[in-house]
Regions:
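Sec/Tat signal peptide C-region and signal peptidase I cleavage site
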Residues: 11-17
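N-terminal leader/targeting signatures
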Residues: 3, 18-19, 88
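Solvent-exposed helix/loop surface patches that form functional interfaces
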Residues: 25-27, 84-190
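Acidic, serine/threonine-rich low-complexity disordered tracts
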Residues: 18-83, 156-245
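Bacterial N-terminal signal peptides
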Residues: 2-11
Length: 245
């Protein structure tokens, strides 16, 4: 599973000042970038993240994060996208349910209409959102790293997304905190926890199994992530390239 990408989440300054025990950057300077590399170590993209909005705090809250991606050889303007996160008792994870909120679906509809050179009316958007929601069913959640990691096993998770007659299932198994390591990247040197898991994705007649090994640092978030195929071959690496403090 693609890394996930990012971990630019912000929270109230009071919570941050009292106890910076979160796997996210400082909300006042939350802008950072990752290098995406293939299995041979060649850079395929640079992705820049920044916090667009935040509600609640890093214990229990949510965040909308903007990311911009451009291929190494591309001279075109990077496309802007958003990903949604939630904090649950200090653990942050991708909030898949947020993608199906009315305002988010409205943004997708506007983007699709704009690509066709048309503009949807508010009534048309409302009708489209209602029809989409009738076809969607979401259950479970994609778990992240706990606020206070302890070396040992972590709970498994399962996320199921149904759209009409299509079902996609994502399972995280063999999850564990396997150790600690000081890791150096272009952004600096960080004391990290190492998290490992096997991610199995099923959609229609296809099944994909990947193992991820991820390094997380307090006050930063994801520092590095290696993804391996089911045979143990390295297929991609995500590496922290820069961060504003």
């Amino acid at each position: 599973m693609t890394c996930a990408i990012a971990f630019a989440l912000s929270w109230g300054m009071n919570a941050y000042a009292q106890d910076n025990v979160f796997f996210v950057p400082d909300p006042e300077t939350a802008r950072w970038s990752y290098l995406e590399m293939d299995g041979n170590g060649a850079t395929t993209a640079t992705i820049v993240y920044s916090v667009d909005s935040m509600t609640g705090d890093a214990v229990n809250g949510s965040a909308k994060v903007k990311f911009e991606s451009a291929g190494k050889q591309s001279s075109e303007e990077a496309a802007a996208n958003f990903i949604y996160y939630k904090f649950k008792d200090g653990e942050f994870m991708i909030d898949m349910n947020a993608f199906f909120e009315e305002d988010v679906l409205g943004e997708f509809i506007d983007a699709a209409a704009g690509a066709e050179g048309i503009e949807a009316t508010e009534e048309e958007k409302k009708e489209a959102i209602e029809e989409i929601r009738k076809l969607i069913e979401v259950s479970g959640e994609l778990r992240g790293i706990p606020r206070y990691p302890v070396i040992g096993a972590l709970p498994d998770y399962e996320f199921v997304f149904k759209f009409s007659f299509v079902t996609m299932t994502v399972k995280g198994t063999e999850r564990k905190i396997s150790g600690k390591e000081k890791l150096t990247t272009p952004a600096g040197t960080f004391d990290c926890f190492i998290m490992e898991e096997t991610v199995t994705t099923k959609a229609m007649m296809q099944k994909e199994v990947e193992k991820t090994v991820s390094w997380y640092a307090y006050g930063v978030g994801l520092v590095k992530e290696n993804t391996y195929d089911k045979k143990g071959k390295l297929v991609s690496t995500t590496l922290l390239n820069s961060i504003n403090w």
